[in-house]
Design a protein with these regions (language model features):
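A cross-family phosphate/adenosyl-ligand binding-site feature
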Residues: 1-118, 124-213, 217-397
Length: 397
C-alpha cells in the first residue's frame, strides 16, 4: 500500500512516545520506508533500539553522530521524505518549529523538509491552552503544517482535559491521507449515502435490512483520501465513520431524503450506496405492541424514492450513481433501473454470489452505463470503491 513511500517520524519527549512504536510497526506492514528521529528527552521514554528493530533503519538522535555512512544526514532524510509526522510534539518542539530553530537533529531535519508536515501536540492541558503554545500552533499552520487536535481525557500528570496524543490508528490515517493516493479528486464535491435505514413499528421494534454500510463507507473514505470534499449521509451502520468526511447521521428514509435532497445540488457526483427502506409502517404505535394470540398485520406505505428524485433534479454537469442489489435477473433489473431513474451509472451485485453483498469485506460488481458494462472480479470493497470512482471521473489506470 505504501511501497516506495518514505515516512519520517519525529518523536519528542512525552509519555506518549511509546505509541509511536505501534505506528512505526503499522507503517512497516504497509511496506513504507520508515525513519525515526528522536530528541534527547524522547530517549528517556523509549529506547531508540526499539525503533531500529521495528523499522530496520538507524534511529537518529545526534546531529553530529559519527557512526553513520557519510552523508549530510538531516538533508538526505529531508529530501527522501514523502511526509513528516512530529508526534508526540511537545510544547518545546512546537516552539522550535514555529520559529525556525534548528538546534538538534529533529528540528534541523524538519526545517529542511519540503514535503507535507503533520504535528500532533501532546502535553499538559494548561501548557496546550497557553496562549503562547496556541500562537505557535497557528504559526505552524500558517507555514503549511497540519495540526492534529489532541484528544481529551485523563493525562499522565493526573489532570483531565485536552492534551492527549490520538491513538496510533488515527495518526496512521493522517499519514495515509497524505501519501496513500494521488490527489486526483481534489476540488471535487461528492455525496455518498450508506448503511440501512430504520422504520419504527413502535418504541421497541423497527423494520430494517442487512446493510452494514461497508461499501458506502469504503467509497467515502477512498474519495476523501484522494482529495475530494466528501459528505457521507449514513443510516445506523455497523462500522465507524471514516475520517476526513462530513458525516451526516440519519435513521429513517425520511431523514435520509431530507439530508440528501438539501445537499445534492452543489455536488459534482452523488453515489447512492445506502439500502433505504422502500416501505414504512403507516401507523407507528406510541406504546410497545403487546404479543397476542394469532397473527398481526402491519399496514405499510411507500417511502420517498430518493434516487428517483435525484434523477429528476440532476444537473447536466452532475454524475449520479446508484446501486442495485439483486438475487435474480441482476443485469436486466439493473439496466431497467438505470433508465427509469435517469442514472449515469448503476453498480449491480448479486447477493447469492460468494464474496458479494452485505457484511463482507469483498464485493463482486458490474458497473453498468448506457452503452458500457464493466464486470469486476472479486475485490476488496476498498478496491471496488477505487474502480467506481475511476469510472465516474474518467480516470484510467
Amino acid at each position: 500500500m505504501l511501497a516506495g513511500k518514505t515516512v519520517l517520524l519525529c518523536v519528542s519527549g512525552s509519555i506518549a512516545a511509546y505509541k509511536i512504536a505501534y505506528l512505526a510497526s503499522a507503517l512497516k506492514k504497509l511496506k513504507a520506508d520508515v525513519h525515526v528521529l528522536m530528541t534527547r528527552n524522547a530517549t528517556n521514554f523509549i529506547n531508540p533500539i526499539t525503533f531500529e528493530t521495528l523499522t530496520g533503519n538507524k534511529c537518529l538522535v545526534d546531529t553530529f553522530d559519527r557512526n553513520f555512512e557519510f552523508s549530510v544526514e538531516h538533508v538526505s532524510l529531508a529530501k527522501a521524505a514523502d511526509v513528516v509526522l512530529v508526534a508526540p510534539a511537545s510544547a518545546n518542539v512546537i516552539a522550535k518549529l514555529a520559529h525556525g530553530l534548528a538546534d538538534d537533529m529533529l528540528a534541523t531535519t524538519v526545517l529542511a523538509c519540503t514535503c507535507r508536515k503533520i504535528i500532533s501536540p501532546a502535553m499538559n492541558t494548561r501548557m496546550f491552552e497557553n496562549p503562547i503554545t496556541q500562537d505557535n500552533l497557528k504559526i505552524c499552520e500558517h507555514y503549511g503544517m497540519e495540526v492534529i487536535s489532541p484528544a481529551s481525557g485523563y493525562l499522565a500528570c493526573g489532570d483531565t482535559g485536552a492534551g492527549k496524543m490520538p491513538e496510533p490508528e488515527v495518526l496512521l490515517q493522517y499519514i495515509l491521507k497524505e501519501v496513500q493516493y494521488e490527489k486526483d479528486l481534489k476540488g471535487k464535491k461528492i455525496l455518498v449515502t450508506a448503511g440501512p435505514t430504520r422504520e419504527a413499528i413502535d418504541p421497541v421494534r423497527y423494520i430494517t435490512n442487512h446493510s452494514t454500510g461497508k461499501m458506502g463507507y469504503a467509497i467515502a473514505k477512498t474519495a476523501a483520501l484522494r482529495g475530494a470534499d466528501v459528505t457521507l449521509v449514513s443510516g445506523p451502520a455497523e462500522v465507524e465513520p471514516p475520517m476526513f468526511v462530513n458525516f451526516v447521521p440519519v435513521v429513517t428514509a425520511k431523514d435520509m431524503f431530507e439530508a440528501v435532497t438539501s445537499r445534492s445540488d452543489e455536488m459534482d457526483a452523488v453515489i447512492k450506496a445506502a439500502a433505504v427502506a422502500d416501505y414504512r409502517p403507516k401507523f407507528v404505535n406510541t406504546e410497545k405492541t403487546k404479543k397476542k394470540d394469532g397473527d398481526m398485520a402491519i399496514e405499510l406505505e411507500r417511502t420517498d424514492d430518493i434516487l428517483k428524485w435525484l434523477g429528476e433534479h440532476k444537473k447536466d454537469s452532475q454524475f449520479l450513481c446508484g446501486f442495485s442489489m439483486e438475487t435474480e435477473h441482476m443485469l436486466e433489473n439493473s439496466r431497467a433501473k438505470l433508465k427509469k431513474k435517469n442514472l449515469d451509472m448503476i453498480v449491480a451485485n448479486n447477493l447469492k454470489v460468494a464474496g458479494a453483498g452485505f457484511g463482507t469485506d469483498t464485493n463482486v460488481v458490474t458497473m453498468i452505463r448506457e452503452n458500457k458494462e464493466t464486470e469486476l472480479p472479486i475485490m476488496s470493497k476498498e478496491e471496488v470503491a477505487g474502480a467506481i470512482l475511476d469510472e465516474i471521473f474518467g480516470i484510467e489506470r
